[in-house]
């Protein structure tokens, strides 16, 4: 952030840019932590990011034995907003996912706010989600 153009900006502009960058980094780190912990807690399931030409599901937990999956958005935010779950209610994305991974049994936004249901979407506190995961220790580690 020692760039000439950056330094030519006013203090409020520089602060806003730094805050935006920091929030983006926190969001990506949170996604990585949730994916890793969920994978470790679900050795019989496939846990991955599912990308589409436009947008993605931040996490899919696919159970091949049940031919079913859960889809997630992971947000480093304390606020609920419809745009945060827009991919979870996208009919085309859901149809493609169900065709490939079976029935979608749950749609969840993991975020830093309170647990609640909104329009069929479960908003779950990410800290509670992580605390409730039962991680199986890896033998020999």
Where are these regions (language model features)?
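Short, charged, amphipathic alpha-helix that recurs within catalytic cores of restriction-modification
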Residues: 77, 82-101
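Short, high-confidence coil segments that cap the C-terminus of an alpha-helix
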Residues: 44, 101-104
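Short conserved micro-motifs at the rims of enzyme active sites and ligand-binding pockets
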Residues: 3-8, 73, 83-84, 119-121, ...
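Domain-level recognition of nuclease-like catalytic cores that cleave nucleotide substrates
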Residues: 109-141
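A structural signal for isolated positions on well-ordered beta-strands in alpha/beta enzyme cores
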Residues: 48, 70, 106-109
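Conserved catalytic cores of phosphodiester-cleaving nucleases, focusing on short active-site segments
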Residues: 34, 38, 59-81, 88
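Accessory nucleic acid-recognition modules appended to NTPase machines
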Residues: 1-57, 63
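Small/polar glycine-rich anion-binding or flexible loop at a beta-alpha turn
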Residues: 53-58, 107-111
């Amino acid at each position: 952030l020692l760039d000439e153009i950056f330094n030519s900006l006013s203090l409020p502009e520089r602060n806003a840019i730094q805050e935006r960058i920091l929030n983006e980094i926190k969001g990506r780190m949170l996604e990585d932590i949730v994916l890793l912990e969920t994978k470790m807690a679900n050795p019989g399931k496939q846990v991955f990011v599912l990308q589409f030409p436009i947008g993605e599901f931040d996490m899919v937990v696919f159970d091949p034995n049940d031919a079913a999956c859960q889809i997630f958005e992971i947000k480093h935010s304390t606020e609920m907003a419809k745009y945060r779950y827009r991919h979870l209610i996208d009919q085309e994305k859901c149809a493609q996912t169900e065709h490939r991974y079976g029935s979608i049994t749950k749609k969840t936004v993991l975020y830093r706010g309170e647990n609640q249901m909104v329009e069929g979407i479960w908003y779950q506190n990410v800290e509670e989600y992580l605390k409730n995961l039962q991680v199986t220790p890896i033998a020999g580690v």
